[in-house]
């Protein structure tokens, strides 16, 4: 599926973006930074409302023509609205770290988003699908930091900053209609992050590069893969997270979660499922689905 297929292309799309830019930039003396900040706040609120109200929205980037850097500004502004309601930051997630995910989503760049405590669901419990619009699930690896990460790390340093690793599943739920978006839209939408289920953490960080990954629905294998699909070694996701956070002027406190990215393509969720992931030598995680998406 090419998720950018409906975002518009060619002269018509370029003209629309140019007209939008002109309308914003030539406000008869209006301060551009004020206009830009207002637009970012407006788009952040649109995405926040879509998530809160479980109401999909049309893609935003084709209309407003924002850049990737501006998409991250929208993302942070949207997460700030969550924080203002009392949600607490708990870590970060990386996206498009596997070739399968890039192909499925029709993009070619690694992206990252922010996690809050409201996104965490109890392992083994029922996850109400009415919390989402059109949820999908993907098997992942999650790291727990033992020390503050305040600078870019090398692969050789990473283990010294980690308390453990766990099998995990991420529930993704694009706020865009029919799960169709371009790169800027998905970044603004916090990389589609909606929920996280974690298994037990283990301190054993050895040999993470090629462990078998199986995700099952009601006991039937629906996705098979390897941790090697995550940048060749999931520990490289920690390196990338440290670089991205530092570039954004952020630190990751001790006790932060780092969702390393998907090992396989995502699968759509439906009511009445027992969903599980097992990772060789690491353990498993599971949940059930209740309600209706």
Give residue spans per PLM region:
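Intrinsically disordered, low-complexity terminal tails and inter-domain linkers enriched
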Residues: 1-35
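Catalytic-core "active-site belt" of small-molecule-metabolizing enzymes
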Residues: 32-233, 247, 270, 274, ...
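Short, charged beta-turn/beta-strand-edge "cap" motif at the junction between a beta-strand
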Residues: 263-267, 281-284
């Amino acid at each position: 599926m090419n998720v950018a297929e409906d975002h518009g292309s060619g002269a018509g799309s370029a003209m629309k973006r140019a007209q939008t830019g002109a309308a914003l930039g030539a406000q008869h003396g209006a301060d551009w930074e004020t206009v830009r900040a207002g637009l970012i706040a407006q788009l952040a609120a649109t995405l926040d409302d879509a998530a809160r109200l479980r109401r999909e929205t049309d893609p935003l980037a084709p209309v407003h023509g924002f850049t990737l850097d501006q998409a991250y500004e929208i993302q942070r502004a949207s997460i700030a609205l969550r924080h203002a309601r009392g949600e607490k930051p708990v870590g970060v997630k990386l996206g498009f770290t596997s070739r399968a995910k890039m192909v499925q989503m029709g993009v070619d760049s690694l992206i990252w988003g922010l996690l809050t405590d409201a996104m965490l669901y109890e392992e083994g419990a029922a996850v109400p699908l009415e919390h989402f619009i059109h949820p999908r699930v993907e098997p992942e690896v999650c790291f727990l930091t033992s020390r503050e990460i305040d600078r870019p790390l090398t692969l050789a340093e990473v283990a010294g900053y980690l308390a453990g690793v766990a099998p995990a599943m991420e529930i993704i739920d694009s706020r865009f209609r029919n799960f169709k978006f371009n790169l800027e839209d998905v970044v603004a939408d916090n990389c589609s992050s909606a929920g996280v289920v974690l298994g037990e953490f283990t301190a054993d960080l050895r040999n993470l590069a090629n462990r078998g990954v199986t995700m099952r629905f009601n006991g039937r294998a629906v996705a098979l893969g390897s941790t090697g699909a995550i940048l060749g070694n999931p520990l490289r996701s920690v390196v990338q997270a440290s670089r991205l956070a530092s570039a954004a002027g952020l630190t990751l406190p001790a006790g932060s979660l780092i969702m390393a990215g998907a090992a396989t393509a995502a699968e759509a969720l439906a009511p009445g499922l027992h969903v599980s992931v097992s990772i060789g030598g690491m353990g498993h995680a599971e949940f059930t689905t209740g309600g209706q998406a």
